[in-house]
Amino acid sequence: MNNNLQGDAIAAAIDVLNEERVIAYPTEAVFGVGCDPDSETAVMRLLELKQRPVDKGLILIAANYEQLKPYIDDTMLTDVQRETIFSRWPGPVTFVFPAPATTPRWLTGRFDSLAVRVTDHPLVVALCQAYGKPLVSTSANLSGLPPCRTVDEVRAQFGAAFPVVPGETGGRLNPSEIRDALTGELFRQG
């Protein structure tokens, strides 16, 4: 996609996000659906769309670490833990950090932590940079159906009018690996 078309698609996506709605976009492995993490209305729309309970918690995807800092508590990280995390970012590894009390429950669910990732997908980086903050990100699929890997699959599952940022996934076969930021424990193999 040329830069003008990508810029137009990102601008249109930001308009949708500002309306507290949900968008779809390509990530490292599959298409994701996402929204403004600070909008309870938008997150509830996403959870309803996915038929996902709020208590499960969500993942935030960001252009850089600074975008994630308001949502996580990194004060307990040692220098070695920081090095480990930053050696994997940007990239397809999600880390679960402690969350401060100010992080909304609609993001953390029943947990006192939050899963976050600094992406290396160029389109998502550009989207988060243009929006100025991270996005809630979960796989684009309706309950019981496989995650979408193309724009056509997103439209087939969510409807022709669903707002999609067109582009290619990063080509990975599996969703992101998920690890505990403090212990390194593997929660999901990538």
Swiss-Prot record:
It catalyses: L-threonine + hydrogencarbonate + ATP = L-threonylcarbamoyladenylate + diphosphate + H2O. Keywords: ATP-binding, Cytoplasm, Nucleotide-binding, Nucleotidyltransferase, Transferase, tRNA processing. Its EC number is 2.7.7.87. It is found in: Cytoplasm. It holds the Pfam family Sua5_yciO_yrdC. It comes from the Bacteria. Residues 7-190 form the YrdC-like domain. One of its GO terms (cellular component) is cytoplasm. GO terms for molecular function: ATP binding; double-stranded RNA binding; L-threonylcarbamoyladenylate synthase; tRNA binding. GO terms for biological process: regulation of translational fidelity; tRNA threonylcarbamoyladenosine modification. Its main location: cytoplasm. Coiled coil: none annotated. It is an enzyme of class 2 (transferase). InterPro entries: DHBP_synth_RibB-like_a/b_dom, Sua5-like_dom, TC-AMP_synthase, TC-AMP_synthase_SUA5. Required for the formation of a threonylcarbamoyl group on adenosine at position 37 (t(6)A37) in tRNAs that read codons beginning with adenine. Catalyzes the conversion of L-threonine, HCO(3)(-)/CO(2) and ATP to give threonylcarbamoyl-AMP (TC-AMP) as the acyladenylate intermediate, with the release of diphosphate. Belongs to the SUA5 family. TsaC subfamily. This is Threonylcarbamoyl-AMP synthase. It comes from Escherichia coli O157:H7.
